[in-house]
Structure formats: C-alpha cells, structure tokens
UniProtKB/Swiss-Prot annotation:
The lineage of its organism: Eukaryota, Fungi, Dikarya, Ascomycota, Pezizomycotina. Keywords: Chaperone, Disulfide bond, Membrane, Metal-binding, Mitochondrion, Mitochondrion inner membrane, Protein transport, Translocation, Transport, Zinc. A motif (Twin CX3C motif) lies at residues 38-63. This is Mitochondrial import inner membrane translocase subunit tim10. The twin CX3C motif contains 4 conserved Cys residues that form 2 disulfide bonds in the mitochondrial intermembrane space. However, during the transit of TIM10 from cytoplasm into mitochondrion, the Cys residues probably coordinate zinc, thereby preventing folding and allowing its transfer across mitochondrial outer membrane. The gene is tim10. One of its GO terms (molecular function) is protein transporter activity.
Amino acid sequence: MSFLFGGAPKMSSEQKIAAAETEVEMITDMFNRLSESCSKKCIPNDYREGDLNKGESVCLDRCVGKFFEVNIKVSEKMQGVAGQQQGGAGLSL
C-alpha cells in the first residue's frame, strides 16, 4: 500500500524483467527510426565513396542532435500531461 503515500509499488522480478524488455524494445525502436530517418536525409542512394564525406557527417551529426532534442521535448511534455492527469484524478475523489 506504499503507492497510496507516493512511494512506488514493489515490483516482482518478472515485472522488472518485463519492464526492462519493454525499455530495450523502445530504445531499439528509437535507434532504428533515428538511423533510418537521418540516413535517408543525409546519405545519397548512389554511394560515391566508402566513407562519409564531411557534408554527410555534419548532416548526420545535426540530424541526430535534432532528433534527441525533439525526443526530450516530447518526453517532457508527455510526463507533464501524465502528471496533470494523475493530479487531476486524485482531486476527483
């Protein structure tokens, strides 16, 4: 009943494993979306060299930076919305 007083409820080992697996899936999905999006934007389909040139490297660096900035902003916004919903739910008792 610690969750009634602000503490997190105890999780069993199975729940912890399931939560960790979900987190790994989310991170893998984010990495795949990042790779696909930035590669599509920054690397041409006709490869001319074996290595990235300076323009491609700079483009990828900026793309990854923007991707993480947006990801952080969206996460913060969603946490704020979730907090408001939890706060509002407690007041309606």
